[in-house]
Amino acid sequence: MSTNFNYVNYLWDEKKATSLGDDQVALFLYRSNILGADLRITNYGGGNTSCKTIESDPVTQKDVEVMWVKGSGGDIGTLTRSGIAGLYTERLRDLKKVYRGIEHEDEMVALFNHCIYDLDSKAPSIDTPLHGLLPFKHIDHLHPDALIAVAAAADSEQITKDIWGDTMGWVPWQKPGFDLGLQLEECLAQNPGIRGIVLGSHGLFTWGDTSYECYINSLEVIEMSSDYIEKKIKANGSVFGGQKMTSLPKEQRLSQAAQLAPILRGLCSSDNQMIGHFSDDAVVLEYINSHDLERLAPMGTSCPDHFLRTKIAPLILNLSADENLDDSKAVREKLTPSFEAYKKGYEAYYNDHKHPNSPAMRDSSPVIILFPGVGMFSFAKNKQTTRVASEFYINAINVMRGSEAISKYTSLPRQEAFDIEYWLLEEAKLQRMPKEQPLSRKVALVTGSGGGIGRAIADKLIAEGANVVFTDISDDFLKEATASYSTDQAIACNCDVTSKESIDTAFAKASLQFGGVDIIVHSAGLAISKPIEDTSQADWDLLQNVLVKGQFLLAQSAAVVFRKQNLGGNIVNIASKNGLVAGPNNLGY
C-alpha cells in the first residue's frame, strides 16, 4: 500500500494512531482532522466522516451497532468528540419504513433525534442517512476539488468509468437527505465490491474496514482523479482557453487592491456592513485573466458547499487593471451601475425561484468580486466568513479548471441552487448562529497599541466584536500584543504617527486585510520629563509631532478611507490628564 502521493498530503502518523489503541471513535476523529487539514481534500465545514462501533445498550444491556458521525455545522479539520452524533444504526435504517418520499424529505431530520444513542450528541446533520444506510465501518464524504471536477463534468458518469473502471459507483445530482442515502444504498447493491461512489455535482463517498484503510482509500481515489485531470491539462496545453491578459506586478496589484477595497466595501454594504478579504493567489489570477472567464463565471458554482458561501455567481469589475483610482468618487460612480445590476439580478433569481414558504431574501450584494489583472475580493459579515468564501471560490475555480480540461463544466440548474441556498434547514442553521456583538462588522485602527492604554483599548474593541489593526513603533511590543489573536481578529503594523507615508501604509494594510477602517483611536504618545532649561528643540518637536501633528496626519488619512467607503466613521483622540493639569516638568502640555 503506497503512501506516496503527488496531489494530496499523506499525514497519517502511525505513532499517533497507535497511541489511540483500539478506540475506533478516536481513530475516526484523528482521520477526520488530518483529512480536513488539506484544503484540496475538503473545504472548511465541508464533508463529513463516520465510524460504526459495537456498544452496550444502556437499557437492554445488549450489544448494538452505533454510528458516530460529524454533527451539523462542524468542520472535520477541527472535529472533536463534542462535535459528533452517536445514533443507533438499526433504528436509523428503520426510518425507511416511515419515509414518505422526496417531497417530505425535510421531516426526516426531526426523526434522526429518535435514533440518538449518545445523549450528549451534537445535532445530526442532513447527511446522516448517507452514512447510516451504507454498511461500512468507516466512511468519508469529502469535497475534493479534483473529484468535484469529475462530478461537475458534462459526461461525469463516463469519466468516472474512464478513471476507475468498475471500482467506483456513480449517482446523479440529488439534494442531500434521506433520498440520496437510498440512492447510495441502491448503487452499492447494484455494484457490489466498489470502493466508493461519485455524487454528481457534489462530491465523493469512500470507505474502509479500518480508519486507516478508509483514509488510504480516500487519498488513492482523489489522487487518481487529480492525475487524470493534470495529464489532460498537459495534453491540452492550456486551461480556461489561455490567458487573455497578464497580471500587474505584485506590488502594483496590492496597491490597486488597497485603493479599491474601501470603495468596494462601501458598495457591498448598502444593506449590511461587510468585512473584506483580498486574494491574488496564482489560481485566481490564471482564472480571472483567461479567455473563458466571461463564459464560466456567470454559470455559477456547482457544489452546494461552494455557492452557500459565495452566492451563485461573482461580480466581474469593468475596470482596467491599471485603472487610475485616485478619484474615488468617479470610480464609485463608474462601478455603481454594475452593483445595481448584480443586486437586481439576484432579486430576480430569488423571485423567479422562491416557494411560498421560502425564507426572506438575504443581502443581494455580491460576495465574490473579480478584478482581472489584480485579484479577487470577498465581502461577508465577518473576517472568518469572508476568508472562507474566498477559499471556497478558489475551490470552485479548481473545479471549473478540472472539468473544462476533461470535458465541459456544468453548474447546477438555478432552481436546484436556489432550493439549497434557501433550504429551510439551512435557514434554521443560520438562525442558530450566535448573536452579533456590538462592534461586529467594524474595523478599528489603534495607534500606540503595542502596550499600555492603546493595547487595553484594542483588546476591548476585539472583545466587543471589532477587527483591529494594532499599530506601534515597536515590532516586539506588537508581536506580544497580538500573540493571542488570529489574523481573522487582528493584525499588527509598524507605524510612526509622525510620518504620513507610514500612516498611509497602515491604512493600506488595513484595507487589504479587512476592506477598510471604521474607527480610529489615536493613543500613541510619549512623555519627556525635563525642566524647561534642559529641554531641547528636538525634544519639543518630537512631542508636538507625536501628540499634535500625529493626530492631524492620522485624521487626514482616515478621512480619505472614510470617504471611499461612504459609511461614516469615528475618530477618537486619547487625551492626557496633563492636558488639563500638567505635572512637574511636563512642559509639552
Range-by-range predicted roles:
Residues 576:
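Residue(s) in the substrate-gating loop at a strand-loop-helix junction
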Residues 555-556:
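A short, exposed helix-loop element centered on a Lys and neighboring polar residues
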Residues 535, 582-589:
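Active-site loop-to-helix junction immediately N-terminal to the catalytic Tyr of the SDR YXXXK motif
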Residues 442-467:
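Canonical Rossmann dinucleotide-binding motif of NAD(H)/NADP(H)-dependent dehydrogenases/reductases
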Residues 531-532, 539-541:
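Substrate-binding pocket helix/loop in short-chain dehydrogenase/reductase
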